[in-house]
Regions:
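Charged/polar, low-hydrophobicity segments characteristic of intrinsically disordered regions
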Residues: 59-89, 131-137, 167-169
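Internal helical hairpin/lid segments
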Residues: 81-107
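Short, small-residue-enriched loops and turns at beta-alpha junctions
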Residues: 20-21, 93, 123
């Protein structure tokens, strides 16, 4: 650890392997929704609320996953993950910066959008496939509003603006 750390790069150890992985998955889905928020003229305040809801969903999914005992962590460790660079830091960057393919997909989600064309223009969008996988296994993973909202927009063709309004009810 000491051999590779610098002033600009710090390693933070965690036992919460599941939480870090779930953070990466939900972060991509959240970035799609953050792009849709921006495209539909929501303020950054709503993206911050989205991030908070996303952290709640990460905690919910992580705490419910039935995993091997050696990977289980207590609530304190999961909360530490939520505020770590692996979760909060990565989510902020991905939700606010237009270089994210997931956010760019969301930016294309306005009114009558052509999802196939948007995906063709961007290429691989991890959050798109993750949304389907989590939704298909929703009972197992105890998904919440983030995954459901993304699924309603991306796979059910529901109006993005009305889905986003429901997200914050």
């Amino acid at each position: 650890k000491n051999n590779i750390e610098t002033n600009a790069f710090k390693l933070i150890s965690t036992k919460d392997i599941i939480g870090v992985e779930i953070s990466g998955i939900i972060k991509n889905i959240s970035a799609i929704l953050s792009g849709a928020l921006t495209a539909n003229h929501y303020t950054d305040e709503y993206i911050q609320k989205l991030i908070e809801l996303s952290q709640d969903e990460i905690f919910q999914i992580t705490s419910k996953i039935n995993c091997r005992e050696e990977y289980r962590v207590n609530d304190k460790e999961m909360i530490k993950t939520l505020s770590s660079p692996a979760c909060l830091g990565d989510m902020i960057l991905t939700c606010y910066k237009d270089h994210s393919r997931n956010r760019r997909l969301g930016l294309g989600l306005i009114n009558k959008f052509n999802l196939d064309q948007v995906l063709k223009d961007i290429g691989t969008v991890e959050g798109y496939m993750s949304t389907s996988t989590l939704y298909q296994n929703r009972k197992k993973f105890h998904i919440g509003k983030i995954v459901k909202t993304a699924h309603d927009i991306l796979y059910n063709g529901n109006n993005p603006k009305s889905c986003l309004e429901k997200l914050f009810d």
